[in-house]
Every structure is written in C-alpha cells, then in structure tokens.
Regions:
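Extended, folded cores of ATP/NTP-driven motor/assembly subunits in large transport
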Residues: 1-285
Length: 285
C-alpha cells in the first residue's frame, strides 16, 4: 500500500501535463505488455517529448531507486499471421460512484493481473493493457459536490443526478443501483441507500479527477485463443468491483471500430469517446 500511495503522488504530480500548448499532446500512457516471442512482462510509459523532464522528475523524486531508460524500439504484441482483438473498459454505472480502491484491499490487486499475463504462451501469444491519462477539462469535483449536497438534504440520488443535467451520456442512471440481495440485507440494515450514496460520492470527490482510456489488446494464432486471452485479462478487473458503487465492464470492438482501436493503441492516442472520469486513487488502483 505504501508503493501504491506513492503512485498516487506520482499521478498528482503529472496533472501539470495539462499546461501543454494546443498543438501538443496533453496525455501520457502507462502500459503493461507481454510481447510475442518474449517471456518477460514489460511495464512501459509513453510521455510526450516536451514532458519527458516532468516525468523523470516525478518518478525519481518519489522512487529515488528507480531506473528510467529510454526505449527507442517499441514492443510488439501482434502474432505474425494471427488474429488480434481488443476492448475498451467502460463503467457499468454512473461515474459519480467509485470503483473499489487499493486502500480497501488485503492483497495487491496487481498480482492478479500479472497472473493472467503469466499464462500466455511465449510464442504465439501477446497482450497489453494500455491506460491513457489526460487532464479532465470538466470540473467534476464541483459538479459531483453539487449532487452530493442535494443527496445530503434528502433528495434521492437518482433524482439529484437527473436534476443536475450533468455529463450527458456519461451519466447513465443505473436502475436499482442500491438494490441488495437477501444475503446482504442483514449487513446493510443499519445503512440507508442515501447514506451509502453519500459515502461513495464523498470518496469519489476525495481526490482530483482525470480522464482515462483503458484499452486491452490481445493477439494469438486463432481468434478463439485471442478471445480467451482478452477475457482472462478483462476478468482480472472484476476484483475492482465496489458492490455499492461501480465496476468495470468491457466493450469488444469489431470491424471498423477495431481498426480504429488498433490505430489509437499503436499511436497511443487519447479517445474522448471512451474517457472515464476516475479520481487519482481509482487510477492508482
């Protein structure tokens, strides 16, 4: 948890990437990859050249023993003559509600992700998780706190969100988001749905919010195997479900959308369409 807390400091320091000129990229990526024909999992960061000094300064100030090395040759997850598949992470519920964060885990959630990569064959299989970070242009904290104040006054959470008119398609109101199973009723009887909503919104607004694209790409000799690799990696995100808040779901891409996905993946471009508003603690997790 100490390391994860330090990563949260790193992301906070990288918020200044927003001070970029209009014609320059204002985002960076962190990637976990297992290239085809290589049995070593790579942790990779891609930063615009004009922000390289910022990145190195942030990393070395927080992790003084870290070694930052320029990698001029990019990795390649794609199997020659094979099939490649990809998906974007989306939020299953309203983004005002947070996913489960690292401070509530009794184990390192990263180990579960690493385990899925370790099962991929050295030759004939490759995969990557690419997270693109970009400063949010919208003041989510202010908007979410406005909704929070209404809920604290007794306005039902779904009504408070509707009244805010905030976020358009991003703010899809979940139906029965607070419905509980019979097994959970005893545990929750002391908490009303509104008190749970208040706690979750307070957690969401507890640290700055950025935008993130989360892409998962996989490649193998057959589509079935590529789909299996993709499914296994997607499943590793299940541990991040907050039963009273939010969870990740994944949109599989096909045809033209898949072509655009791999273009954006290869060039590490940011997609506004698949932007997820996540606070720094969620991103760290």
């Amino acid at each position: 948890k100490d390391v994860l807390s330090s990563m949260e400091q790193f992301y906070a320091g990288m918020l200044s990437i927003s001070g970029t000129k209009k014609h320059e990229k204002a985002h960076f990526t962190i990637e976990l990859a297992l290239p085809d024909k290589i049995d070593e999992i790579i942790l990779y960061a891609a930063v615009p050249n004009h922000k390289r000094d910022l990145f190195e300064k942030q990393i070395l100030s927080i992790f003084p023993d870290a070694h930052v090395r320029e990698q001029k040759n990019d990795y390649n997850i794609f199997v020659e003559g094979g099939i490649s598949v990809g998906s974007y992470a989306t939020l299953a519920r309203n983004p005002i509600f947070p996913i489960k964060t690292y401070d509530t885990f009794n184990h390192d959630p990263f180990n579960v992700v690493l385990n899925t990569f370790s099962k991929i064959e050295t030759e004939g299989g490759g995969a990557a998780i690419q997270v693109v970070f970009s400063p949010a242009q919208t003041n989510y904290i202010e908007e979410y706190k406005g909704i929070l104040r209404k809920v604290q006054k007794g306005v039902p959470v779904k009504e408070a969100i509707k009244e805010s008119g905030f976020g358009g398609a991003l703010l899809k109101v979940a139906i029965d988001i607070f419905s509980s199973t019979s097994k959970k009723k005893d545990e929750e009887k002391k908490l009303s749905p509104d008190s749970i909503a208040i706690e979750n919104i307070q957690n969401k607004t507890g640290s700055p919010i950025m935008h993130a694209n989360i892409r998962i790409a996989a490649s193998a000799h057959t589509k079935n195997r590529a789909d299996d690799i993709l499914s296994d990696i997607e499943s590793s995100f299940n541990q991040l479900e907050n039963t009273h808040g939010n969870k990740f779901s994944f949109e599989r891409l096909s045809r033209g959308k898949l072509d655009l996905f791999f273009k954006d993946f290869s060039f590490r471009d940011y997609s506004e369409k698949y932007a997820l508003p996540l606070n720094l603690r969620e991103m760290t997790t």
